[in-house]
Amino acid sequence: MAKIIAFDEEARRGLEKGLNTLADAVKVTLGPKGRNVVLEKAWGAPTITNDGVTIAREIELEDPYEKIGAELVKEVAKKTDDVAGDGTTTATVLAQALVREGLRNVAAGSNPMGIKRGIEKAVAQVTEKLLEAAKEVETEEQIAATAGISAADPAIGAQIAKAMYAVGGGKLNKDSVITVEESNTFGVELEVTEGMRFDKGYISGYFATDMERLEAVLEDPYILLVSGKISNIKDLLPLLEKVMQSGKPLLIISEDVEGEALSTLVVNKIRGTFKSVAVKAPGFGDRRKAQLQDIAVLTGGQVISEEVGLSLETADLPLLGQARKVVVTKDDTTIVDGAGSEAQIEGRVNQIRVEIENSDSDYDREKLNERLAKLAGGVAVLKVGAATEVELKERKHRIEDAVRNAKAAVEEGIVAGGGVALLQAAHVLDNDLELSGDEATGVRIVREALTSPLKQIAANAGLEPGVVADKVSQLPQGEGLNAATGEYVDLMAAGINDPVKVTRSALQNAASIAALFLTTEAVVADKPQPAGAAGMPGADEMGGMGGF
């Protein structure tokens, strides 16, 4: 495909125009009085959202240079979302401010490489200042405030804080699994699952012990974990006899249980001879093996697998796991109070954390995080309902963002919200870091850009941005504008805070992309095809569908 090339100022201005188009659509959502954006979908109802990265992903521009500029800013939003789970709009606003001021100085004759170095040094200093100013999250109220701001609903923030405590063993835990599900009921309900839950239920409905609830409840069972299929009852019989003699029920988790092995278990369950439940192992392939091993560690058992030289025929009771209780429905299995040793569980948790750090795949990281949380302390489910499908999607998305926001707060602490932490951290740049020339210009660009989130929040609230920024810059540390009321207050005391991880990630990612913009000297893009060039021959004459 033929290419078109733009150089120098033309290249940078094309990129900037794309950035501005995207940023202008995103920044109207910032702050408590920010607006929503409606996104048309190819099918189904439109989506209404105030999430920066969701809006950014939907924007596709026609001009090739503008399209590249927009794609670069999408990367800012996406990277911030990946790292911190929120702050995508703040990152976009910062990127726009840095690029605008930077390009103005480059056009006036400044050296872009010098400006880039100045920006990088300034961002490093501001990041250090933010981390110093961060306060650890110590109470449920602080988490509720942080999550409530992100979700734009204090009641939802309180539910998220309650969920984090419930699955964190009575303390805040960033590894807690909190899932958000759509519900037919109205409002938000919290359901906490103690222990480990995975999404596989009993293989046969005959295993149910409570026909009203359609669930099988096993008290103090043995747990048999098998990596392959079980079909031959002769392989299983020696172990079954030993379990029967112990008087305990048996949970079997394997790739599958079929044929005479399944029918024998069902018949004995119906007759009341022996209580057991067979469940398919969760996941597929290598992920299934890993999850089986997780369950083995949690329950104090071993996975029966030829790979480690173990077979069903020779298996004995010490190889089986145990738990205080197991509840199996048609859809999922919950293991409560596994008998695994704390040291082994902690070792497994640390191993999964290392895998998360080394993974390049978002999907793999998500699955590893799920495994981590199941081992680290249970699962909380927030069930979300709303009057319409459009409202339900918007609400669910908002709550998912708030959950990630809360976890980020636990991880690195919180700072004053409302764009105030960035503006007040800018004081470390007052002497231009004792730099000179173009590097000092880069520092001044960052100092000016740090006021942009607060100014945008003020603008969205109908206030004069410049006046608000001047007023806040003169206030004591941590005091600033409560845009919801228009008052100037101690933000931390008022529960208006942001996770420092979100704030610093937004700044670092915005600065990274801004530096690329400023140092760009040429842009190579695909040459746009003339309208209709990609269509079928004769499409114009035949209505585009061969005359049909």
Swiss-Prot record:
Keywords (A to Z) from UniProt: ATP-binding, Chaperone, Cytoplasm, Isomerase, Nucleotide-binding
GO molecular function: ATP binding; ATP-dependent protein folding chaperone; isomerase activity; unfolded protein binding
InterPro entries: Chaperonin_Cpn60_CS (IPR018370), Cpn60/GroEL (IPR001844), Cpn60/GroEL/TCP-1 (IPR002423), GroEL-like_apical_dom_sf (IPR027409), GROEL-like_equatorial_sf (IPR027413), TCP-1-like_intermed_sf (IPR027410)
Compartments reported by the entry: Cytoplasm
Cellular component terms (Gene Ontology): cytoplasm
Catalytic activity of the protein: ATP + H2O + a folded polypeptide = ADP + phosphate + an unfolded polypeptide
EC number: 5.6.1.7
Pfam families for this protein: Cpn60_TCP1
UniProt binding sites for ATP: 29-32, 86-90, 418, 482-484, 498
Domain of life: Bacteria
GO biological process: protein refolding
Assembly: Forms a cylinder of 14 subunits composed of two heptameric rings stacked back-to-back. Interacts with the co-chaperonin GroES.
Record HAMAP family: CH60
Functional summary from the UniProt entry: Together with its co-chaperonin GroES, plays an essential role in assisting protein folding. The GroEL-GroES system forms a nano-cage that allows encapsulation of the non-native substrate proteins and provides a physical environment optimized to promote and accelerate protein folding.
Family per similarity comment: Belongs to the chaperonin (HSP60) family.
Protein's name according to its UniProt entry: Chaperonin GroEL 2
Organism the protein comes from: Corynebacterium glutamicum (strain R)
